């Protein structure tokens, strides 16, 4: 089965290769391959094709490594539109020897043609420049001895020695015999005397087809078309590669003298036509002279009776017809065939008819038509359509008329990027023709805003339908209003007025509205615009309030609600609808007296999820509540947690992660670990009562110790059965923990003689602790998990964030700035508790600009701790080009002043918003047709800079926790640098315990719900930052409150795609916003994606000013609230 799959994949890749090669007619002309003192050249031609990527000429080091390394001077061939050229003058003849290639690309696939040049004064000369054989052929590669020397002869393959001939046995014709040639035998073979070098070597290239003679395909089982006039069957496509001077499906049609190319449109412009030109085509053809010429230099005319490339074809003309050395037999009227042996209607080169030069179409389905004449009439397989990107299409429908073949193609979705030159191509036995035509794809109009609901009743809605503004191309021909109750099918009505009343609606029902615009032309109806949701008024009672659904037992759920009070004198009751999500037919409706506030839903199935809703009915039915969901309790033990992984192991900590299966009423997770070799009763249990948590950091572990870790799931029945234990071994003791003596010595210096007494007491206490440690290990581990962080302490030159840990960390040493070396200038930033000032500082004897951060007088203790924490983070991070680096710090009168790099262009958010040139300088925007002073490349560079910096932070195991455009600074040369490390934490998982202002719009779901922060939550924030970059500083979730975000994000709602954003960039954002943290990409993966986008030079962020352009909204009050 695997081999069959591999065969299919091989076939697909080969088919794609053939399509690409068929879309580009690439030719390499090697003028005078035997180099003497005359000028010589290489010319690479993309005939009849306009490639998106430039064609190139280079040295082929794969074929020949030990050749000159000098770069080639590649220039445009002024005589042709799409051609490159390399010319060597006489004085550079010594640097020419070697192997070369010409390369073109279509849709990312490369087509490479190879050739060689060698000295005419070489000791040996090859019989031919290239030799093409089939797999299994017996091959003789021969070199003619030109110079006689008393030296051994040596033969190389691809620069590696393979054979030698003693000096007294060197024949006039030096041969290499290869019986039953295989593809691995292919390569460049060279011959010289042992005392020679590259300049005296002769080269020939052997090409071995992957298949046996007249076979092609992935498994070489399909028969080749018979290729005439020495054409070569391509082993991947079965098509004939025609030699220069012939064309058509079987290469039977001869071109006019001195012309070449797939459609014979190219011409040799010299006085003697194609003399001295060696034509090289894609493998497996190789190189040959043009038709009518032979010899290594292609400067010898064919003798009488011979024609074709290298004059290898012989005329056998019947009826005494003339043999032309360029075209072969010239048949009289009424005769045809290679030898004019067939009587009948002469073949006519195909012609493309009735194809306009320009076509305008709407985006969507497109059915272009190609019509061709000729004899014989082209078949369906002989007509193709080539898109601007090189994609080759086959006809979807085909028919014949009296004089024409008509091919109808289908493009399921044509888009504006498909605009450009398309090519209709016809290739028959009578020849080949191509006709380019231009297609302009118009963007279908789409409203930018949802229709506004002015008023509603229980059965109507008054709607403002405005088509302005809209995205896409006009003019607007018609408008349709689509409407439907939620979860039902759409209906529509055509409207002409902007204010429209929609009647016959259902009471108290959620409806959705949107508008569809249409422009002139077939398929001119655009995609419906944004959806507006509204609810019609109620004519019944509202649903019960305070509904709660909880499991009661394995077969029962308990539904409760608040007491119901109505103004109606009619009797009322509560109708409860219960449905199983696993068994669709299991549905029950229960009537409950109105004076009750609960109902027990019994006779249910264990471990099954149910959905419940309720309404209050009188004589009229009331409004249904929202659906509630709950599982019945499990009747079996829960399964063992799955995908258990242990990672990020240090000398005292390790991260444990897992996943659980839904439906087993799992209420908590138990992590049990113990030192290897200790008794079972000496284990430590950590119970996590929130079953949605899927990772936990073990702390307080012993260095260089092996632990056994077990994880259990617990539900109403009990704990899951034990599975195999996972082994964990901590790293050796880190140096940071071993250098505590320095901190104690500093304390001794400060406290003096009194400190000596404290040290003695402390040492005695530590000794006692060490003795008791084995007995109280469980209590110590539990205490470690619940430690809190005390106040910040700092002294000049050191920083200590003391924590109630087993071992206090060393004070962080920071570079000290002298207070007198700081000259303050302007305030450049200010917050509620801090201030940033521009200053000139003196550091290491040099004056430089810096940004100085300090806390205000009324800042809280937590704010001071976070500020000192930022200095600690910067010290530990070290230097990186994409973070704001520390210059130094200074303590003055009890306040800490932090000096960091000065970013002359400010923060990224303001920088992006200032680029909105349509708002700041409309005249400039209109004149330059741009909506921003920043290009797509610059915006992607900002994104890549931040990703690179965050990758560095994650490698250092730091979590930023406040990643947003406002906290990115733009430095010299417009390099983005990550700043504001006040909330950063140097650990894999951080649980926030203090209350404070939170950046809600940038926070991940797990951070909002559980206050848990990881590198994965930084990835979520990065996705929002990427959205800010693309939207040029828009406010995330503009128009939504924080409360709405708490509700909608868990339901799958995400930021919408900016209109100027490519699908690939938005897909990267969506990957960052995946609900499960472990499914989000790492910063290293994000950086790889962005670097690839930068290399492709594609416009991923469109800043072109199109009609009806609008920027993403900005809501400063919402940003402050976050």
Curated annotation (Swiss-Prot):
Molecular function per GO: ATP binding; protein tyrosine kinase activity; signaling receptor activity; transmembrane receptor protein tyrosine kinase activity
EC number(s) given by UniProt: 2.7.10.1
Domain Ig-like C2-type stretches: 44-123, 350-440
UniProt keyword annotations, A-Z: ATP-binding, Cell junction, Cell membrane, Cytoplasm, Cytoskeleton, Disulfide bond, EGF-like domain, Glycoprotein, Immunoglobulin domain, Kinase, Membrane, Nucleotide-binding, Phosphoprotein, Receptor, Repeat, Secreted, Signal, Transferase, Transmembrane, Transmembrane helix, Tyrosine-protein kinase, Ubl conjugation
Signal peptide span: 1-22
Chain positions recorded as ATP binding sites: 828-836, 853
Disruption phenotype: Embryonically lethal. Embryos die at about 10 dpc, due to strongly decreased numbers of blood vessel endothelial cells, leading to severe hemorrhaging, and due to defects in heart trabeculae development. Mice display a general malformation of the vascular network with defective sprouting and dilated blood vessels. Conditional by inversion allele knockout mice don't have Schlemm's canal. Haploinsufficient mice developed a severely hypomorphic Schlemm's canal with convolutions and focal narrowing.
Compartment(s): Cell membrane; Cell junction; Cell junction, Focal adhesion; Cytoplasm, Cytoskeleton
Activity regulation annotation text: Angiopoietin binding leads to receptor dimerization and activation by autophosphorylation at Tyr-990 on the kinase activation loop.
Domain Fibronectin type-III: 444-539, 543-635, 640-733
Active site positions: 962 (proton acceptor)
Processing after translation: Proteolytic processing leads to the shedding of the extracellular domain (soluble TIE-2 alias sTIE-2).
Domain Protein kinase, residue spans: 822-1094
UniProt GO BP: angiogenesis; branching involved in blood vessel morphogenesis; cell surface receptor protein tyrosine kinase signaling pathway; cell-cell adhesion; cell-matrix adhesion; endothelial cell proliferation; heart development; heart trabecula formation
Disulfide bonds: 44-102, 211-220, 224-233, 227-240, 242-251, 255-264, 268-274, 280-287, 289-298, 302-311, 315-323, 317-329, 331-340, 370-424
Glycosylation positions in this chain: 140, 158, 399, 438, 464, 558, 595, 648, 690
Membrane-crossing residue ranges in chain numbering: 747-767
Membrane topology: Single-pass type I membrane protein
GO CC terms in record: cytoskeleton; extracellular region; focal adhesion; membrane; perinuclear region of cytoplasm; plasma membrane
Domain (EGF-like): residue spans on this chain: 210-252, 254-299, 301-341
Family, similarity comment: Belongs to the protein kinase superfamily. Tyr protein kinase family. Tie subfamily.
Function: Tyrosine-protein kinase that acts as a cell-surface receptor for ANGPT1, ANGPT2 and ANGPT4 and regulates angiogenesis, endothelial cell survival, proliferation, migration, adhesion and cell spreading, reorganization of the actin cytoskeleton, but also maintenance of vascular quiescence. Has anti-inflammatory effects by preventing the leakage of pro-inflammatory plasma proteins and leukocytes from blood vessels. Required for normal angiogenesis and heart development during embryogenesis. Required for postnatal hematopoiesis.
Domain notes: The soluble extracellular domain is functionally active in angiopoietin binding and can modulate the activity of the membrane-bound form by competing for angiopoietins.
Subunit text: Homodimer. Heterodimer with TIE1. Interacts with ANGPT1, ANGPT2 and ANGPT4. At cell-cell contacts in quiescent cells, forms a signaling complex composed of ANGPT1 plus TEK molecules from two adjoining cells. In the absence of endothelial cell-cell contacts, interaction with ANGPT1 mediates contacts with the extracellular matrix. Interacts (tyrosine phosphorylated) with TNIP2. Interacts (tyrosine phosphorylated) with SHC1 (via SH2 domain). Interacts with PTPRB; this promotes endothelial cell-cell adhesion. Interacts with DOK2, GRB2, GRB7, GRB14, PIK3R1 and PTPN11/SHP2.
Record-given protein name: Angiopoietin-1 receptor
Species annotation: Mus musculus (Mouse)
